[in-house]
Swiss-Prot record:
Subunit structure: The system is composed of three essential subunits: KdpA, KdpB and KdpC.
Stated name of the protein: Potassium-transporting ATPase potassium-binding subunit
Molecular-function annotations in GO: P-type potassium transmembrane transporter activity; potassium ion binding
Cystine pairings recorded for this chain: none
Signal sequence residues: none
Any single GO CC term annotated in Swiss-Prot or TrEMBL for this entry: plasma membrane
């Protein structure tokens, strides 16, 4: 146990070193300040602007920014869906894979456009190298860049500045943040044995004399942006549990840090951009404490093991079901909480095999969406909770609510409410329909409490743009592909539109001078109140579902 806890502690310590450095760099990128990469990247960006016809880098309003996001994402989706549909006749298909069904192609396209990467297929048997490279790999960069661009536009609006230009923000997000880090990390993974080849699957002879086919492909570069962009969609069916995606402990450390580095650093970037690093560190500390607490209770459940198995063996063993021995229970726990907290969705073990405390913690992350949160958008959701907290505390003490020197009024609260309410709606409505008709809408492999968790997790993962799953669910059917596609769209674009309109509303407000009566948001007390609001509004909404799922399952096992 001690060794496992030391591994977790080392990872978190490295993360704390990364946060201020990467956060500062990203602030310079979006504030258009000079960076060390300017001599290389400025010519590249100018070339991209020239090719794309982006001659005027004019500032956009909130609605213009939202339209640009949606229009560009639609075009990307049409392009990728076309590649899937004609996969059988396109190059880079050494295994001659046919095109997937139309509903699987539609679901996969929407899933990757929305930065969710929810997979109802196994990559090595469904999509060709060309589809993985030019369709899925392309969307991994653009969807992550879209999230970062929206977050930066939102922060600019909060402090009264123009929201910026979406196409410029998207380009800079990819060229200055995603590409450099993905390139370096891809080379590191390559050095650890992750393959990068266009050769067809290899046939080998096993020690027993049988012939086995080993799937491979251009994995290393795919894996790096998969983790860095919080995409999470694996090249292989079992994702980062596969030894060709994640061979050893060092690669596991690199991939864990990759999925954590940008969302954690964005909070520091926010502090730099508003000129208040103290508030950024307070917010970071609040999220970090919740994050560590979730790791602790999940680790407790996994270390104690399954009481049914332990009673049968008359000994106490950790729960190793669904885990890779090369990682063990500790690294699987850290990964599970990190991947559901950051909305990455990649897995190095099976979440369906987690003990009830682990299932509770992962669902808790998906419900809140701010324990680091999705690429860019998770940070924006955190600020929405700050606005709600300012409004509520202002009502309680009889002060006019203000945030960053601007009044919070009815219009802002309406937008904030839409952002917070669309998430439970997108999860609970289709989840209830599925549970009412389990025989017709087949796919649930576990009866009882765990079956409830499977269904809710699938829709929560889609609504939160996470993509992981309790993979005991048989989800490659017409119902699951279409219903989760609708949830994916609702969970991605309704909040983005509301966020940008909220930012535009804040931008248009006249700044209010700070007085002795102004509620300060950079204090420990306000941060504690914010944590309470997050738990009340975010967690209690889903308490009945948690009670019917992992909590009931835990009591059944003898908590």
């Amino acid at each position: 146990m001690v060794q496992g806890l030391i591994q977790i502690a080392i990872t978190l310590l490295l993360l704390l070193i990364i946060v201020p450095n990467l956060g500062n760099y990203m602030a310079k990128v979006y504030l258009k300040q000079k960076t060390v990469l300017d001599p290389i990247l400025l010519p590249l960006e100018n070339l991209i602007y020239a090719i794309s016809g982006l001659r005027s880098q004019r500032e956009m309003t909130g609605w213009q920014y939202a339209r640009s996001v949606i229009f560009s994402n639609i075009l990307m989706g049409i392009f990728v869906f076309s590649l899937f549909s004609f996969q059988a006749i396109l190059p880079f298909n050494p295994t001659q894979l046919a095109a997937p069904s139309w509903h699987l192609a539609l679901h996969t396209t929407i899933s990757f456009v929305t930065n969710t990467n929810q997979q109802h297929y196994s990559g090595e048997t469904t999509f060709s190298y060309g589809s993985q490279l030019f369709a899925l790999g392309f969307l991994m960069f653009t969807s992550a860049g879209t999230g970062l661009a929206v977050a930066m536009a939102f922060i600019r609006g909060l402090i009264g500045e123009p929201l910026g230009n979406f196409y410029v923000d998207l380009t800079r997000s990819i060229t200055r943040i995603l590409l450099p880090i993905a390139l370096i990390s891809g080379l590191i993974l390559l050095s650890q044995g992750v393959p990068e080849t266009l050769s067809p699957p290899a046939s080998v002879t096993t020690l027993q004399g049988a012939t086995q086919t080993l799937a491979r492909g251009p994995v290393a570069h795919f894996e790096s942006i998969k983790q860095l962009g919080e995409n999470g969609g694996g090249f292989f069916g079992i994702n980062s549990a596969h030894p060709f995606e994640n061979p050893n402990g060092f690669s596991n450390l690199i991939e864990t840090l990759l999925m954590l580095c940008i969302p954690t650093s964005l909070i520091y970037t926010y502090g730099v951009m508003i000129g208040n690093k103290k508030q950024a560190w307070l917010l970071f500390s609040m999220i970090f404490i919740i994050y560590v607490f979730l790791i602790a209770i999940t680790a407790l459940g996994e270390y104690q093991g399954n009481p049914l198995v332990n009673n049968l063996l008359t000994t106490q063993q950790p729960n190793l079901e669904g885990k890779e021995i090369r990682f063990g229970w500790a690294q699987t726990v850290l990964w599970a909480i990190s991947t559901t907290g950051t909305m990455c969705g990649a897995v190095n073990g099976m979440h369906d095999s987690l003990m009830p405390l682990g299932g509770l913690s992962t669902l808790f992350n998906l419900f809140l969406q701010i324990i680091w949160g999705g690429q860019g958008t998770g940070t924006a959701y955190l600020f929405v909770f700050l606005i709600i907290t300012v409004f509520l505390t202002g009502l309680m003490v009889g002060r006019s609510p203000e945030f960053l020197g601007r009044k919070i009024e009815k219009r802002e609260i309406v937008f904030a409410s839409v952002i917070l309410l669309v998430h439970p709606f997108a999860i609970l409505v289709p989840g209830a329909i599925t549970l009412v008709f389990p025989e017709i809408l087949s796919g649930i492999s576990n009866p009882g409490f765990h079956g409830v968790s499977q269904v809710v997790y699938e829709y929560a993962s889609a609504a939160a743009n996470n993509g992981s799953g309790f993979e005991g669910l048989g989800d490659n059917t017409l119902w699951w592909n279409l219903s989760t596609s609708v949830v994916l769209l609702l969970g991605r674009y309704v909040p983005i539109i509301a966020l940008l309109l909220l930012a535009e509303s804040m931008r248009q407000k006249q700044p209010v001078p700070e007085t002795t009566g102004t509620l300060r948001t950079d204090t420990g007390l306000f941060t504690a109140v914010t944590a309470g609001v997050i738990l009340i509004l975010g967690a209690l909404t889903f308490l009945p579902v948690l009670a019917l799922g992992p909590i009931a399952e835990g009591f059944k096992l003898g908590w």
